[in-house]
Amino acid sequence: MMKKNLMLIFGGVSFEHEISLRSAYGIYSALMKLDKYNLYPSFIDKITGIWYLLDSVPDAPELIKRDSSAIISLIPGCGIFVNDEDLEIDVVFPIVHGRTGEDGAIQGFLKMMDIPCVGAGILGSAISINKYFCKLLLKSFNIPLVPFIGFRKYDYFLDKEGIKKDIKQSLNYPVIVKPAMLGSSIGISIAYNDTQIEKCIEEAFEYDLTVVVEKFMKVREIECSVIGNEQIKIFTPGEIVVQDFVFYDYDAKYSTIPGNSVVFNIPARLDMKHLLDIKEYAFLTYKCLELRGMARIDFLIEKDTNLIYVNEINTIPGFTDISMFSKMCEHDGLDYESLVDNLVSLAFQSYAKRKERIDFKRLEN
């Protein structure tokens, strides 16, 4: 049986570029061990956005070679080319975190190219990455969320005092301020009073045009891995215990060694009710957002009340050596290599289902 051609896309014009490189190295290593696919590692430069075909995914960013003779051309309706040679890609595994990778852009382009894509589709990606619109949708399905307010930059500067008053009255201090479309806790800060809120909001606007402000609470941070298309597998949740940080920010996630300031507990220490509720909310969230392939759904449990809240959805979760997504799957018996292989299979299955639905010859006759 001939091997399929798999393109692994990583890097990207994104604040999460460096995390993508680490995730790509893990996935590439797993795919090499599987030896089931012809691999085409494709790197997107952070500054120029140029796509380069690489020989492999190096374990250090400085080893990436930007060879002008290996620039990738993408032509909808024709194919993916390097030096006029069609690579004949059968499936793409995008591991670009944040903008262009998780917002539906790559997914939409690959749909136009008629190439199967690992992970969520256009709609699920676009909604999930935008914290504000995602919360509005989940709220309409009565999924529990931390009290929040969202607004665009234009509206804020049009009525700054009105929005600040609304935050104080509706949420009360302290509050946590987030750019709507960034992951890895980039651009997030906490405001404890009227003086700080303005600074926090304006800092968040440096990253995005929409900001979400949430009530800040003392919480437990629970994460849940989910994979599947029509049939969904929900894995045993894990807990992140943050010891030396106010919340699980970028430094806590990627600049510390697990076991020092951050401890991963898999499984999370939950009573049966909380365990079942979290799995149910994970299932409902996955379905409401029309996700497929994979997602990591993050939860908060308020320490004072024990109430559960859905926090964020990651349609392309981290695959680094310290990422929770694969570790939770591994706890339930699905090792890293098998997880990666399953995700590629799910992409082919989803593509085949979509092609069945869109049978133009049958519909037109």
From Swiss-Prot:
Cofactor annotation comment: Binds 2 magnesium or manganese ions per subunit.
UniProt key word Phosphoprotein: no
InterPro entries: ATP-grasp (IPR011761), ATP_grasp_subdomain_1 (IPR013815), D-Ala_lig_Van_CS (IPR000291), D_ala_D_ala (IPR005905), Dala_Dala_lig_C (IPR011095), Dala_Dala_lig_N (IPR011127), PreATP-grasp_dom_sf (IPR016185)
Predominant location category: cytoplasm
Superkingdom assignment: Bacteria
Subcellular location field: Cytoplasm
Gene3D superfamilies (alphabetical): 3.40.50.20, ATP-grasp fold, A domain (3.30.1490.20), ATP-grasp fold, B domain (3.30.470.20)
HAMAP family in UniProt: Dala_Dala_lig
GO biological processes: cell wall organization; peptidoglycan biosynthetic process; regulation of cell shape
Name used for this protein in its record: D-alanine--D-alanine ligase
PROSITE patterns cross-referenced by the UniProt entry: ATP_GRASP (PS50975), DALA_DALA_LIGASE_1 (PS00843), DALA_DALA_LIGASE_2 (PS00844)
Family the entry assigns: Belongs to the D-alanine--D-alanine ligase family.
GO MF entries: ATP binding; D-alanine-D-alanine ligase activity; metal ion binding
Keywords: ATP-binding, Cell shape, Cell wall biogenesis/degradation, Cytoplasm, Ligase, Magnesium, Manganese, Metal-binding, Nucleotide-binding, Peptidoglycan synthesis
Enzyme class: ligase
Catalytic activity annotation: 2 D-alanine + ATP = D-alanyl-D-alanine + ADP + phosphate + H(+)
Gene Ontology, cellular component aspect: cytosol
EC number from the UniProt entry: 6.3.2.4
Function of the protein: Cell wall formation.
Positions bound to ATP: 168-223
Cofactor(s) in the UniProt record: Mg(2+); Mn(2+)
Binding-site list for Mg(2+) 1: D298, E312
